[in-house]
Structure formats: C-alpha cells, structure tokens
Amino acid sequence: LSDFVTKFNDRNPGKEVLYFNYAAVDDALTNEKCSFWHFRWDANSSIKMAAITTYLKTQPDVKKVYLINQDYSFGQGVRKIAAAMLKEKRPDVQIVGDELHPLLKITDFAPYIAKIKASGADTVITGNWGQDIALLLKAAADAGLQANWFSYYAGGAGGPTAIKQTGLAGKVHDIVEGDPNTAPEAAQKE
C-alpha cells in the first residue's frame, strides 16, 4: 500500500494522499521502502524485538528459545530480527527451533507445539496475531507446554480470551504501544 500511495502521489501532483498506517510494523516500511507519504503510529518490528530482547537480558532462566512465526514478510522479519538480537544480547541462549507456518491457514497447532515441546524450549518468541496466536496458545495449553511466551500481538483479537481460557496468564508477555498520559504536571506545560 505504501508503494501504491507513493506512485499515486507522483502521478497526481496537488492531490497527494497520506498513508496513516496503524498496524503494519514490517521494518521495510521505515527502511528500504520508506516514503514521505507513509506515517506509522506503531513501533516497527525491530523496536518491539529490541524491547523483548532487552528484557530477556535480565532473565537468566531463559536458556532455550523457539521461534515460530507466520510465513509472510512480517513473520520472516520477526524471526530474522529475533535471531540477530538474541545473538547480540544473549549469546548464551540457544535457538532450538525456527519455524514458519502458513498465514491464517492452520486450525490445529498441535504438531507445531509437539516440536516446541520436544525441543526443550523454555521460551517461545512469536509475531503471530489473530487466530494464529489464539490457536497456538490453545494448543500449547492442551499439550501442557509450560514455556514463557513473548509476543507482539497476544493482546490483540482472540489473544486475551485464549490466555484466560487456557490458564496461561503469567506465561504470555506482550509488547504493546500506548501513552498512559501519566506525565507529571510539569511535562504537560507548554
């Protein structure tokens, strides 16, 4: 969409449009495909992974990480960034699995969870969203997988319900954007 907006604006001077992007966090949109006409509200994928891996630096119990992501540009980016940042910040951590699955086509994640469980992973990192995160967490609970989960979108549609229904509260950690508007009064002055 960002490419389309840029091309449209090039062809229609004086009738330019601006692409307000709420949720596409692929790094390419603010790197190699950066456009003056694109404005993103959310942090990009690298910023989110930097938050996760910076936190993981403080978690000595994390020894084995499994990466599972949706097979499209975003999921491929998450796996690449996660592997690079873990290597940089936690070289002692072993990546015991790195899996891509079809986007929004899997209805039973049990085979994927079996691989995660067999790998001995104590932590799972995923960019999954929508039904893919909900069904992934449900399958994890059904299989008794007690790993910690670090996610970009477990707080999105279906995620909180899945976490509640599966008893994984306290095991699923999610990166969210927001402004609690709790700045001190002095910061609110012009």
Which positions does each model-derived feature cover?
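Short, solvent-exposed loop/turn and secondary-structure capping segments
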Residues: 2-4, 31-32, 78-79, 137, ...
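Ligand-binding clamshell of periplasmic/extracellular solute-binding protein-like
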Residues: 1-2, 21-29, 126-134, 151-161, ...
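Beta-alpha junction/loop-to-helix N-cap segments that form part of ligand/metal-binding clefts
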Residues: 1-31, 41, 101-109
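Short helix-capping segments at alpha-helix termini
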Residues: 8-15, 86-94, 141-146, 165-170
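Hydrophobic/aromatic residues located in beta-strands of well-ordered beta-sheets
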Residues: 19, 65, 95, 149-150, ...
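Extracellular/periplasmic Venus flytrap/periplasmic-binding protein
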Residues: 26-28, 36-144, 181-187
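Extracellular/periplasmic periplasmic-binding protein-like sensory domains
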Residues: 35, 42, 140-190
